[in-house]
């Protein structure tokens, strides 16, 4: 296979995986520390994309739109935690699933009332609209390289924050033994609010960065939420390292299989059948990967230390 095509698909997989990491990192922290299943996590990603598109369209500044999306969605996430989700901590997981599913419907309707049914456009910054020549003959969009760089920087910042700071120590203590951490003076309620706000901010960052590549529309968070759950199952619940490894695995497997499978099937079947069957099999491969990890290591590849 052509080297340029392989390199492009690897970069696409890296970019997709790092965007999944932004969603999965917040989700795995909420699930691992707060022991809460939040189905509305994808809705915060959608809100972030809408805020970025709206503010960017009004001001003409992509950076300002992205900043407003991150700040606004973080505040929304903390308000939701304080007003609604805090009441669910002592409930069973079924109650959490039902309540956060209702929250999905409410947020979808709220977005529809504010911005309408039609998708919003979020334009790529003019300075990043062209390609960059990485190697002779290998051109890659500058904006996608920005996404990769931001994803790597966020991953590094999260690792440093969780492992090298006092707040990170509180987060790890809350994940290991909530009652003991509270007995030692950690304000668990405030910690939960901060963690949920951080998860919402990461969702908004992913939504704002992916807005120029995808349609900003109602319901855009549901499909990517499923992939985020797959990531944390593969990587290990509560583990930032696991979320990063799982995201990269899912991103690379999904991107590579969508390119390689149709080409491989054309050698065995008609082009029409290969074109229709290839993408379907590529989607299944992610769940085959998850099933294999669950069979081999039910706790995930890098589970959080308890």
Question: What feature does the model see in each segment?
Answer:
Residues 25-49, 90-95, 167-170, 188, ...:
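Short, non-helical or kinked segments that cap or interrupt transmembrane helices
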Residues 1-22, 51, 59-65, 91-96, ...:
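Membrane-interfacial amphipathic/re-entrant helices at transmembrane-helix boundaries
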Residues 11, 33-79, 83, 261-274:
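Membrane-embedded helix boundary and interhelical linker motif in transport proteins
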Residues 87-164, 191, 256-285, 299-306:
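Transmembrane helix-bundle core of multi-pass membrane transporters
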Residues 16-17, 137-220, 240-245:
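Helix-loop-helix "hairpin" substructures at the membrane interface of multi-pass membrane proteins
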Residues 60-71, 193-203, 207-208, 213-287:
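Transmembrane alpha-helical segments in multi-pass inner-membrane proteins
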Residues 49-54, 70-76, 103-111, 150-159, ...:
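Hydrophobic core segments of alpha-helical transmembrane domains in multi-pass membrane transport
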Residues 60-104, 110, 245-250, 254, ...:
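Alpha-helical transmembrane segments within multi-pass membrane transporters and channels
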């Amino acid at each position: 296979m052509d080297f340029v095509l392989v390199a492009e698909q690897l970069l696409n997989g890296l970019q997709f995986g790092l965007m999944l990491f932004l969603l999965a990192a917040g989700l795995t922290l909420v699930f691992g520390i707060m022991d809460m299943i939040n189905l509305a996590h994808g809705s915060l990603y959608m809100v972030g994309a809408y805020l970025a598109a709206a503010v960017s369209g009004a001001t003409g500044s992509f950076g300002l739109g992205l900043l407003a999306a991150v700040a606004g969605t973080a505040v929304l996430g903390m308000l939701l935690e304080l007003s609604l989700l805090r009441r669910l901590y002592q409930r069973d997981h079924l109650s959490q699933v039902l309540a956060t599913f209702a929250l999905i419907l409410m947020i979808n309707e709220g977005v529809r009332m504010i911005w309408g049914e039609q998708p919003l456009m979020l334009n790529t910054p003019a300075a990043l609209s062209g390609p960059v020549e990485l190697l002779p003959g290998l051109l890659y969009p500058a904006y996608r390289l920005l996404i990769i760089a931001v994803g790597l920087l966020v991953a590094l910042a999260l690792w440093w924050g969780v492992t090298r700071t006092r707040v990170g120590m509180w987060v790890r203590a809350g994940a290991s033994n909530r009652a003991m951490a509270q007995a030692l003076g950690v304000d668990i309620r405030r910690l939960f609010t901060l963690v949920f706000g951080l998860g919402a901010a990461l969702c908004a960052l992913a939504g704002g960065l992916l807005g120029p590549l995808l349609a900003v529309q109602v319901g855009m968070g549901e499909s990517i939420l499923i992939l985020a759950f797959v990531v944390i199952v593969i990587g290990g619940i509560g583990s930032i390292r696991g979320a990063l490894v799982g995201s990269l695995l899912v991103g690379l497997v999904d991107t590579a299989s969508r390119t390689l499978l149709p080409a491989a099937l054309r050698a065995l079947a008609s082009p029409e059948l290969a074109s229709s069957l290839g993408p379907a099999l590529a989607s299944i491969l992610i769940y085959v990967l998850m099933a294999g990890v669950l069979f081999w290591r039910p706790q995930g590849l890098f589970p959080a230390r308890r």
